[in-house]
Amino acid sequence: MTDKTTTTTPQSVLSSDLFDGLQADTMERGATISPCGLYRYSLWRKWAPGPMCVFIGLNPSTADATLDDPTIRRCVGFAKAWGFSGLMMLNLFAYRATEPADMKAAQDPIGPENDDALRFAHSNTTTVVAAWGAQGTFKGRDQQVRAMLPRLHYLR
């Protein structure tokens, strides 16, 4: 995966002691965005040492390595309430769009590196939350990801 916006890799966020010395008011932020800027494969926020939670949404919107959008703020709230020390956000479709209709109109809404990002995150954390909602059925993508990642928790 090509990381356009930060030098921290998802691998180091999920599997290292990188955050052992963080102060309470410090949040590590990062994102893996394609060189063309059309796809966001992962986004992470880490506020303390300890386990992270992975969320899989429908598609990325405006959030990036430095900017949070409403979905990211909501997921940070869930992760903190559940006792996690950080989160990684991935999506069924990596195409960046503020409206699902725009994502659905894209030639390749999934993105060439998205399945690799999903598999990596799933294999490197214990809690993966399916949070894609009813529109995840587009192109049968919800079923594809459920088959690829058997250990999912669901938000209802």
Regions found by a protein language model. Name each.
Residues 1-69:
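Active-site and ligand/interface coordination hotspots across diverse enzymes
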Residues 2-5, 97, 103-156:
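Glycine/proline-rich loop-helix segments at beta-alpha junctions forming the active-site rim
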Residues 37, 69-76, 107-116:
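Short acidic (Asp/Glu) patches
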Residues 41-47, 70-87:
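Short amphipathic alpha-helices and their capping/turn segments at secondary-structure boundaries
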Residues 52, 85-86, 127:
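Residues at the starts of beta-strands that form the adenosine-phosphate
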Residues 67-71, 140-142:
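Residues at alpha-helix caps and immediate loop-helix transition turns in enzyme cores, especially N-
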Residues 85-101:
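Short connector loops at secondary-structure junctions
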